[in-house]
Amino acid sequence: MSRQSLFTPALGQRKGLISHTVDLVRALLFDRRYFWHTAFLLFLGEVALSLLVIWKIPYTKIDWPAYMQQVDMFLAGERDYSKIEGETGPLVYPALHLYIYTAFHRLLPSIENVRPAQFVFLGFYLATYLAISTIYYLAGRPSNGGHHFPQVLLIPLTLSKRAHSIFLLRLFNDPIAMLIFYLSVIAFQIGGRKGWRLGCVLFSLALGVKMNILNFLPGLLVLLFQYRGIVGTVEGLSIIGLIQFLLPAPFFFSKSNPYLIRAYFTSAFDFSRQFLYEWTVNWRFISEETFLSRERAVTLLAGHLTVLGLFAAFKWSPVPGGTLRVLRKGFSDPLNQALEVSQVPAYHIPLVLFSANLIGMLFARSLHYQFHSWYFHQLPFLLYSGAGWGNMLTSVLIWVTVQYAWETAPSTISTSAALLAGHGAMVFGLFFHGMKRPSSSQKSKAK
């Protein structure tokens, strides 16, 4: 027997083992049947890493003391929202934010000892991961020309130093608002009358924590019209508006003074508030004078509305006949949905909402480091949906560029320019390489 023949079985077994391992890894990363297997493995890794972060890295004192000082004034009986303030300035967040941090104030053994609060925020962090995983999974349901969002997209969600810092070390309110928002997206994806109503309730609660949730509102308006019709849209907006009025009720009805109503809304939803140039992440490459100018604010608003209009007109109604057909159907039959659910893929709902938010980020007057949480968990979804120009290497390059800008502190001229370029590239990618509108002939063939 030759020497070569002696080793042939062993070599064959080794090749078989390698092939089996490659197949297993491929299945864990891309096969929909193993989506939750991979998601759970990553979840366990996040638990271990997050506990290590809390244990080893000191808490960063930024807004937590100010939140607690604002709560102290609220508990002391102050009901004029414009007079509630902390060491970082006046209270500029809606009422649910104040109630949540009041609960922290009451339940924690000491507001100076933030470690228990960090474990609560660890719960928020892990719940957010599970919520966004659910959104990706539901978006990948194989129906109506849809496609699977592979679980490999979940890996980047575990790689951000900035995300761990925002949730676990700084205890900002942004993660709370985003968690509630993601729960609303799941409700919208589940659908049905109850799903959309519950989604609107959750959306309004998220808005009751922080007004950045308004970035998603243009997309939600489009979706409500498409899935619920005119009457359903009015119903959804009424739910959102009613909750926004009920949340601050203790401030309105504590004294019969109409001024308190105006004081609340002008403080909690102050669209004219100036941002500090020293904290900007996305506009460091312009002068402070230009940064603070009214002309720049007006230009950004005009650009924001224009791009939203373009997406609403050409991208957010991916059915034969497009937006005009959806509008005609909606206005001719206001009691019913303006498009057939069977006409759009499962990823339509999160794609519209997330792209509306990305457009808002592109035209934001200023972004601070905690605002990273407004869209970090959405980036792999968007890049896979066209924001990466349909190319894996381009997607990776954009993701790395954007993350590098957020991880660099303080911001520099180059990192701000890179962040703006990354946002612009993603918006252009979504517009030119995103969801395609099927032609009537394609639709008929599909049938």
From Swiss-Prot:
Ranges per topology, Lumenal: 1-34, 105-118, 192-204, 254-296, 365-379, 433-447
Q: What is its EC number?
A: 2.4.1.258
Protein's GO biological process: protein glycosylation
Descriptive protein name: Dol-P-Man:Man(5)GlcNAc(2)-PP-Dol alpha-1,3-mannosyltransferase
Reaction catalyzed: an alpha-D-Man-(1->2)-alpha-D-Man-(1->2)-alpha-D-Man-(1->3)-[alpha-D-Man-(1->6)]-beta-D-Man-(1->4)-beta-D-GlcNAc-(1->4)-alpha-D-GlcNAc-diphospho-di-trans,poly-cis-dolichol + a di-trans,poly-cis-dolichyl beta-D-mannosyl phosphate = an alpha-D-Man-(1->2)-alpha-D-Man-(1->2)-alpha-D-Man-(1->3)-[alpha-D-Man-(1->3)-alpha-D-Man-(1->6)]-beta-D-Man-(1->4)-beta-D-GlcNAc-(1->4)-alpha-D-GlcNAc-diphospho-di-trans,poly-cis-dolichol + a di-trans,poly-cis-dolichyl phosphate + H(+)
Question: Which GO CC terms are listed, alphabetically?
Answer: endoplasmic reticulum; endoplasmic reticulum membrane
- Pathway this chain belongs to: Protein modification; protein glycosylation
What family name appears in the similarity comment? Answer: Belongs to the glycosyltransferase ALG3 family.
Described by its record, this protein's role is as follows: Dol-P-Man:Man(5)GlcNAc(2)-PP-Dol alpha-1,3-mannosyltransferase that operates in the biosynthetic pathway of dolichol-linked oligosaccharides, the glycan precursors employed in protein asparagine (N)-glycosylation. The assembly of dolichol-linked oligosaccharides begins on the cytosolic side of the endoplasmic reticulum membrane and finishes in its lumen. The sequential addition of sugars to dolichol pyrophosphate produces dolichol-linked oligosaccharides containing fourteen sugars, including two GlcNAcs, nine mannoses and three glucoses.
GO MF terms, alphabetically ordered: dol-P-Man:Man(5)GlcNAc(2)-PP-Dol alpha-1,3-mannosyltransferase activity
Q: Which residues cross the membrane?
A: 35-55, 84-104, 119-139, 171-191, 205-225, 233-253, 297-317, 344-364, 380-400, 412-432
Q: Which UniProt keywords apply?
A: Endoplasmic reticulum, Glycosyltransferase, Membrane, Transferase, Transmembrane, Transmembrane helix
> Which residue stretches are annotated as topological domain Cytoplasmic?
56-83, 140-170, 226-232, 318-343, 401-411
Q: What is its membrane topology?
A: Multi-pass membrane protein
Tagged with keyword Endoplasmic reticulum: yes
Annotated Pfam families: ALG3
Q: Where does it localize?
A: Endoplasmic reticulum membrane
Superkingdom assignment: Eukaryota
